[in-house]
Amino acid sequence: MAAAGDRGGREAACGHDSYRSPLASRYASPEMCFLFSDKYKFRTWRQLWLWLAEAEQTLGLPITDEQIQEMKSNLDNIDFRMAAEEEKQLRHDVMAHVHTFAHCCPKAASIIHLGATSCYVGDNTDLIILRNAFDLLLPKLARVISRLADFAKEQADLPTLGFTHFQPAQLTTVGKRCCLWIQDLCMDLQNLKRVRDELRFRGVKGTTGTQASFLQLFEGDDQKVEQLDKMVTEKAGFKRAFIITGQTYTRKVDIEVLSVLASLGASVHKICTDIRLLANLKEMEEPFEKQQIGSSAMPYKRNPMRSERCCSLARHLMALVMDPLQTASVQWFERTLDDSANRRICLAEAFLTADTVLNTLQNISEGLVVYPKVIERRVQQELPFMATENIIMAMVKAGGNRQDCREKIRVLSQQAAAVVKQEGGDNDLIERIQADAYFSPIHSQLDHLLDPSSFTGRASQQVQRFLEEEVCPLLKPYESVMKVKAELRL
């Protein structure tokens, strides 16, 4: 993100005659876009130069209050056109902005960037942005979990057909299935928080991480160099800085960051794929606006476009983790510049993509529609087959022979299956059992034996316990931001 490069005035290109990433122009929230903007980045560079100067002054370097005040007064006075022209000539973005800052701070010009290297502003700014980007994502993820938790609680007892291999399996409940989604997202919330809290500042380290330039500034005073590093780290709001760096902070950090975002992408993709499949089965739908058009040619269509968008972007988010993996592996010795162009793209895109999928998933989770009658019909189509073992056990209790009963059930089941598969009819296994005198001892028990709630096990209790013991405590730190609604740009 921050290293030598050439914008050459391209930031002025806008409108409809130049490419812009759809992540910024179409999808991501304004607050996340601002965090990765040039304005935020270069303003943070200036803030870092100010913090460095303040700390150096405190530790005895000849820096005046007037110079400090001049820097403070010009933090937002950024001449982007001048910076672009400087970079065009110098082919170095940091020095271009040193000159631009110095131009509006003539008294402080001599002490701007004193003792520092490009990565002092570049890498430290990246770390500040990464931390702040996590701070934007975490409440959004918490809100998604909260909305889905409300949905799971509401649907905790509604029996639905479970699927393994996307083939009918035993019953579960709509709420229990939702808890599978929530559990993955809870793991993501914990992982994002962990990586955010473990971020360390690069600090004040010099060109190859040895702090040689600062040791020279302070005339060999080790303690003052240590104090300088600590003071700037604290000003930036970090608890710790790396003790060891090359010119850059280790690019393993970027792997950690994008790995947890990619893992979030996998969770979102699974959830939204399930919703898309359920929409096809007509059991559940995402919100669909009154004026929304599903197809230009088929007016009856209600396509799950929000879930499809999430899946589309989640694939991109998962793929991005390959960039920092490759980058970290080819950083020769103290650093090479082939990390720079790649990181300008992948770090921003990862957070803008994660931001978009969370905004969209919150919107989906706030308006999920369930169709109980459709669910009930599908359950009734499969339940007779599931109930055969219970029917056999009831017959044995009534005095029947298990083997004889099993054979009769097998024959009747095959006949019923033929009606479903070959004739397209409904499952009539229960009608066949009711018509067979052999099963007369249990005819009065059939309704009880076919009660769907008796096939869902402890699903309802599991939902309640999971929400109370795991989800609610995890969401407690985010209570104050739970009421925020998701706004989709498109």
Swiss-Prot record:
Annotated protein name in UniProt: Adenylosuccinate lyase
Disulfide bonds: none
EC number: 4.3.2.2
Pathway this chain belongs to: Purine metabolism; AMP biosynthesis via de novo pathway; AMP from IMP: step 2/2; Purine metabolism; IMP biosynthesis via de novo pathway; 5-amino-1-(5-phospho-D-ribosyl)imidazole-4-carboxamide from 5-amino-1-(5-phospho-D-ribosyl)imidazole-4-carboxylate: step 2/2
Function: Catalyzes two non-sequential steps in de novo AMP synthesis: converts (S)-2-(5-amino-1-(5-phospho-D-ribosyl)imidazole-4-carboxamido)succinate (SAICAR) to fumarate plus 5-amino-1-(5-phospho-D-ribosyl)imidazole-4-carboxamide, and thereby also contributes to de novo IMP synthesis, and converts succinyladenosine monophosphate (SAMP) to AMP and fumarate.
Taxonomy, superkingdom: Eukaryota
Keywords: Acetylation, Isopeptide bond, Lyase, Purine biosynthesis, Ubl conjugation
Organism: Bos taurus (Bovine)
Binding site for substrate: R26, Y27, R91, H92, D93, T117, S118, Q247, R309, R335, S340, R344
Residue positions where N6-acetyllysine is found in the record: K153, K301
Cross-link Glycyl lysine isopeptide (Lys-Gly) (interchain with G-Cter in SUMO1) mapped to chain: K421
Catalyses which reaction(s): N(6)-(1,2-dicarboxyethyl)-AMP = fumarate + AMP; (2S)-2-[5-amino-1-(5-phospho-beta-D-ribosyl)imidazole-4-carboxamido]succinate = 5-amino-1-(5-phospho-beta-D-ribosyl)imidazole-4-carboxamide + fumarate
Classification via CDD domains: Adenylsuccinate_lyase_2 (cd03302)
NCBIfam families: purB (TIGR00928)
